């Protein structure tokens, strides 16, 4: 008998464990109070978290080690676990099953009974009954006492009492399937990445619990497994995967038996200049920290002070350190378990339980100081980093003082390049940050000077991810930007009230250079002015890369992808693709095929740097870009593929391609003007990231390209053999009667064009910059802009499928 089964048999978790605090109608009247914002998606996803949290509470109690979350095709969600199963007996006070009580009564559940759960997420979430209240329908299945039970609800109202649907079932657990209310939520489409982030978080925090996330909504099923045995130490390493750690991880575990409060802490310093501290109470993230965070900070400062004094290193310090200096480059996950946690609001973003503070502070001080004394070499590296931070802070202070003295002597302290607007009200004022004087000149001519200011930045923009604060202040471009915004910079000086524009718009060219400059500016704002992002003041302009003209009509297109889409759609409207002289694809069906063909061709372009493009394509569409090519059963298909390849590449100077099979490689060869041309395909190449993805995508169009294809566009007929030929033919047909102009930069547009496409508030498109998950954003900026190469390579590989056209 397993540990979980023994606990299940011993459990006293029954109907009498359920305590009731009544009322459910209020949830439907004011859903935002109970589930979060019903308009921005946070409340919608919290519906899943409420059900998952119940399963995790079972795991915390030691009764569950598997949780499944499935996004179903019909838009519903299923959450299941292998815990004890919700109690099914009749509740003495209510006269209905305990399961129905839990689902229909507010504040009903085992969390109110200390014998059922020692710790849980607290009372502010108010439980799964809220999910029921805010669902069009909900279905609850319970496996308990070798019996399967079922109960259904419509808009929170019970259809029929809990019923037994199957007996003699060797299974335990709970399964909840719900469809969110279309009347309550503005949008009921779940975001896979948001759910993935939260479930990964929970898997790290609950070592040994396996969480499976499956998305069945699309043709290609997506499944991710989260299972970590390293706990929060593994979490810290995951968060810091794009940085160099200064030392091995410090791990602190502490239990206070009197209060029932326990602490798990993992942290290390890295070579960056930014702190990243994640705080959790009973698995729930506190974005605004609280008593556990303030306790950690004060405890850590005490540790550094004591260690410096004990070792005499304080005498070597040029400058006194601050609390911020001690946390420069720190990555920390702090998780506390509290029997009765108190939060500042229902969103649980800040812990206010005062009893947590002394326990956390004392544990941090005692255990971390002990670690320092046991690891003197690592401690010295940490102390050196803190002293460097203190010195840099002092240098930055002197640089700011010098800047202030200069500004006092100037008539105006606004930068000379800034073409300011006439409006003095920040709420209506806009600042466009543009690259170079050329684009700046055009923008100044085309703008509405009443409300639009233009700031051209000339020269190389500093990558602040790799620069200390004092070096950043020495950058002309960054200094100009800080002065123009008026807020100051860093925690001591920054004031959002002094911001001169409530729309700060990054406007760069629509090419790869513009993207790089935009990323550098986004890095600066994220690292040093995150308040602008949090308040929704930062935007990205969407200038066009192309202008297409057809007859008298003109259209501006944002990028290469938009141009290709336009040309393809132009041709598709008059196109028919016939398969084996029978089935015909037109309009939506042809458009769906072309979207796959475009993606397929993009992957081929990437892979062509490693192997011949034509051979790769012909093998892929014959399902041979895999280990099947080595099987004798595939010889006939390989011969057919070679015949197709040779018909495409006929040349009087070249012989046909031939093939030789070896144990771990395939050799393709032909003679060109007497010289042998060889292409070697290794078995290990077939197992590479690029080829696996090409092969997967090829299977989705296999049925089409295994037939004889004829394309007709406006009475013109074309024989089609491969996806590349289909795409190129469609694009060429789409170009007929159309002139295309490519803008190399914003400076190539005249002022009227720039106004019409990018500046005019009535016509333009702006992208507002938002941060959904801070630690995910932290990881992305560290990966893309940091010093470590390997995580960046992995990021590019894993996201290559999402790139259709790469402008290089």
From Swiss-Prot:
Class in the EC hierarchy, top level: isomerase
Protein name as it appears in the record: DNA gyrase subunit B
Catalytic activity, as annotated: ATP-dependent breakage, passage and rejoining of double-stranded DNA
UniProt-recorded Gene Ontology molecular function terms: ATP binding; DNA binding; DNA topoisomerase type II (double strand cut, ATP-hydrolyzing) activity; metal ion binding
Principal place of residence: cytoplasm
Site (Interaction with DNA): 460, 463
CDD domains, A to Z: HATPase_GyrB-like (cd16928), TopoII_Trans_DNA_gyrase (cd00822), TOPRIM_TopoIIA_GyrB (cd03366)
Record-level GO BP terms: DNA topological change; DNA-templated DNA replication
């Amino acid at each position: 008998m397993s540990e979980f089964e023994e606990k299940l048999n011993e459990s006293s978790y029954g109907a009498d464990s359920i305590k009731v605090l009544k009322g459910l109608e209020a949830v439907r009247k004011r859903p935002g109070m109970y589930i979060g914002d019903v308009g921005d998606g946070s409340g919608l996803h919290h519906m899943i978290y409420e059900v998952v949290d119940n399963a995790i509470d079972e795991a915390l109690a030691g009764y569950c080690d598997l949780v499944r979350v499935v996004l179903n095709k019909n838009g519903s969600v299923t959450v299941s676990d292998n815990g004890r199963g919700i109690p099914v007996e009749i509740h003495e006070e209510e006269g209905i099953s305990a399961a129905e009580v839990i689902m229909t009564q507010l504040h009903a559940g085992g969390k109110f009974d200390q014998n059922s759960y020692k710790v849980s997420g607290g009372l502010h979430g108010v439980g799964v009954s809220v999910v029921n209240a805010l669902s069009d329908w909900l279905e609850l299945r319970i496996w308990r006492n070798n019996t399967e039970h079922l109960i259904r609800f419509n808009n929170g109202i019970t259809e029929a009492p809990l019923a037994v649907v199957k007996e003699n079932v060797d299974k335990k657990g709970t399964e909840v399937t719900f469809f969110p209310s279309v009347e309550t939520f503005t949008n009921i489409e779940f975001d896979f990445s948001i759910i993935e982030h939260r479930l990964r978080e929970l898997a790290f925090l609950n070592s040994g619990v396996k969480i499976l996330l499956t998305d069945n909504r699309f043709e290609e099923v997506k499944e991710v497994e989260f299972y970590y045995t390293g706990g929060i130490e593994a979490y810290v390493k995951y968060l810091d995967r794009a940085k160099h750690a200064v030392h091995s991880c410090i791990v602190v575990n502490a239990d206070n038996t009197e209060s029932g409060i326990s602490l798990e802490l993992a942290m290390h310093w890295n070579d960056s200049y930014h702190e990243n501290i994640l705080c959790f109470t009973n698995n729930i993230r506190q974005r605004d920290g609280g008593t556990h965070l303030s306790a950690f900070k004060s405890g850590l400062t005490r540790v550094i002070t004591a260690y410096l004094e004990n070792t005499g290193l304080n005498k070597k310090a040029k400058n006194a350190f601050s609390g911020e200096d001690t946390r420069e480059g720190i990555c920390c996950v702090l998780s506390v378990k509290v029997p009765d946690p108190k939060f500042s609001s229902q969103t649980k973003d800040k812990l206010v339980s005062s009893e947590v503070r002394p326990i956390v502070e004392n544990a941090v001080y005692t255990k971390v100081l002990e670690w320092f004394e046991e690891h003197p070499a690592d401690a010295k590296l940490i102390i050196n980093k803190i002293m460097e931070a203190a010195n840099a802070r002092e240098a930055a202070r002197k640089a700011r003082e010098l800047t202030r003295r200069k500004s006092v002597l100037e008539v105006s302290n606004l930068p000379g390049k800034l073409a300011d607007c006439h409006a003095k009200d920040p709420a209506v004022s806009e600042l466009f940050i543009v690259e170079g004087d050329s684009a700046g000149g055009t923008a100044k001519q085309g703008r509405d000077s009443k409300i639009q200011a233009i700031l051209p930045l000339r020269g190389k923009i500093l990558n602040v991810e790799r620069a200390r604060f004092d070096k950043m202040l020495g950058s002309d471009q960054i200094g100009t930007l800080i002065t123009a915004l008026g807020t100051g910079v860093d925690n001591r000086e920054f004031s959002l009230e002094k911001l001169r524009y409530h729309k700060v718009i990054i406007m760069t060219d629509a090419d790869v250079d513009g993207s790089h400059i935009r990323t550098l500016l986004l890095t600066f704002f994220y690292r040093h002015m995150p308040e602008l992002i949090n308040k929704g003041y930062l935007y990205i302009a969407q200038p066009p890369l192309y202008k297409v003209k057809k007859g008298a009509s003109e259209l501006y297109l944002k990028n290469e992808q938009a141009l290709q889409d336009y040309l393809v759609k132009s041709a598709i409207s008059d196109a028919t693709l016939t398969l084996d002289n029978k089935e015909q694809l037109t309009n939506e069906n042809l458009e769906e095929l072309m979207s796959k063909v475009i993606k397929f061709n993009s992957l081929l372009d990437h892979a062509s740097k490693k192997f011949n493009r034509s051979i790769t394509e012909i093998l892929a569409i014959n399902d041979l870009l895999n280990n099947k090519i080595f099987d004798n059963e595939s010889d006939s298909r390989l011969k057919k593929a070679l015949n197709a390849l040779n018909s495409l590449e006929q040349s009087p100077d070249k012989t046909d391609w031939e093939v030789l099979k070896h144990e771990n490689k395939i050799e393709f060869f032909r003679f060109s003007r007497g010289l042998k041309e060889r292409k070697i395909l290794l078995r290990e190449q077939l197992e590479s990231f690029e080829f696996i993805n090409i092969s997967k995508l090829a299977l989705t169009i296999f049925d089409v390209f295994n037939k004889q294809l004829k394309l007709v566009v406006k009475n013109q007929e074309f024989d089609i053999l491969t996806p590349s030929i289909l795409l190129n033919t469609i694009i060429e047909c789409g170009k007929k009667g159309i002139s295309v102009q490519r803008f190399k930069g914003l400076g190539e547009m005249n002022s009227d064009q720039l106004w019409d496409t990018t500046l005019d508030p009535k016509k333009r498109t702006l992208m507002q910059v938002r941060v959904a998950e801070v630690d995910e954003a932290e990881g992305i900026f560290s990966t893309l802009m940091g010093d470590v190469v390997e995580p960046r390579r992995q990021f590019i590989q894993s996201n290559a499928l999402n790139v259709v056209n790469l402008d290089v």
